[in-house]
UniProtKB/Swiss-Prot annotation:
Gene that encodes it: trpC
Organism: Pseudomonas fluorescens (strain Pf0-1)
Family statement drawn from the similarity comment of this UniProt entry: Belongs to the TrpC family.
Pathway linked to the protein: Amino-acid biosynthesis; L-tryptophan biosynthesis; L-tryptophan from chorismate: step 4/5
Any coiled-coil regions, as ranges: none
Keywords from the named record: Amino-acid biosynthesis, Aromatic amino acid biosynthesis, Decarboxylase, Lyase, Tryptophan biosynthesis
Superkingdom: Bacteria
GO BP term, pick one: L-tryptophan biosynthetic process
Protein name: Indole-3-glycerol phosphate synthase
Entry EC number(s): 4.1.1.48
Catalytic activity reported: 1-(2-carboxyphenylamino)-1-deoxy-D-ribulose 5-phosphate + H(+) = (1S,2R)-1-C-(indol-3-yl)glycerol 3-phosphate + CO2 + H2O
Entry keyword annotation includes Amino-acid biosynthesis: yes
């Protein structure tokens, strides 16, 4: 019997979590909360507008920890990080809400969104319509659908629920087979290519470059994971990739927003700042 991969372990726990949550708060209660939530801010629209100008469309991630690296950021105040990212030029935010493997929380998404005007994606392992409605109830503007975690029927169902509640969808792929499934099943304009293999957690930027020719021009390619320096950014930009999801490089910096500006907008110069987020 093979040893379960990281992703398989996460998904097994996620099924338990959904059962526990739905026992506490019913789907109909969540649907009422979703209807009462602030209007969506237009996640896809913001990214498409920025990338169309051939400017970096950065989804800046708020992430305390990961299964592969452990705790990434000790000084973790989501509201302050969100403000810092907005000041640094982020187009959107990504907030981890997975508790067991990423030390995330629903409250982190709410705190980050209230602190800024940027659209926010709920970064989690979505496997059930309950989580999609829950995301909108929390105030999310977009949800992540990971192809390696879903079959085609479930993927289509979750995307349909997202549309019904007013959420954009970012579909995430890692290889050619997943890309083919995503393009066949979903019409979302946002296609994220994760350079990290979710089974082994190994990272290679070649993943994005290899899949790029197979992605239709009417979809926006978002390169995810492994962007650590200017050379990585320039490698993508010369290949006409202008949308990025970056977390760890920012989370390890003293001021995440200044690091964002240094990495993506060096022509603006780096502002003088104290040791705290401001």
């Amino acid at each position: 019997m093979s040893v379960p991969t990281v992703l398989e372990n996460i998904l097994a726990r996620k099924f338990q979590e959904v059962a526990e949550r739905s026992a506490r708060v019913s789907l109909s209660e969540l649907e009422s909360l979703a209807k009462a939530a602030d209007a969506p801010r237009g996640f896809a629209q913001a990214l498409l507008a920025q990338a169309k100008k051939k400017q970096p469309a950065v989804i800046a991630e708020i992430k305390k920890a990961s299964p592969s690296k452990g705790v990434i950021r000790e000084n973790f105040v989501p509201a302050d990080i969100a403000k810092s990212y907005e000041k640094g030029g982020a187009t959107c935010l990504s907030v981890l809400t997975d508790i067991d493997y990423f030390q995330g929380a629903d409250a982190y998404l709410q705190q980050a969104r209230v602190a800024c005007s940027l659209p926010v994606i709920r970064k989690d392992f979505m496997i059930d319509p309950y989580q999609i409605v829950e995301a909108r109830a929390l105030g999310a503007d977009c949800v992540l659908l990971i192809v390696s975690a879903l079959d085609d029927v479930k993927m289509a169902e979750l995307a349909s629920v997202a549309k019904d509640v007013g959420l954009d969808v970012l579909v995430e792929v890692h290889d050619g087979d997943e890309l083919e499934r995503a393009l066949k099943t979903l019409d979302t304009p946002l296609v994220g290519v994760n350079n990290r293999n979710l089974h082994t957690f190994d990272v290679s930027l070649e993943t994005t470059l290899d899949l790029l020719p197979r992605i239709p021009r009417d979809r926006l390619v978002i390169t995810e994971s492994g962007i650590l320096n200017r050379a990585d950014v320039e490698l993508m930009e010369i290949s006409d990739v202008y949308a990025f999801l970056v977390g760890e490089a920012f989370m390890r910096a003293e001021n995440p927003g200044i690091e964002l500006q240094r990495l993506f907008f060096p022509e603006r110069g780096v502002p003088v700042s104290g040791s705290t987020l401001d």
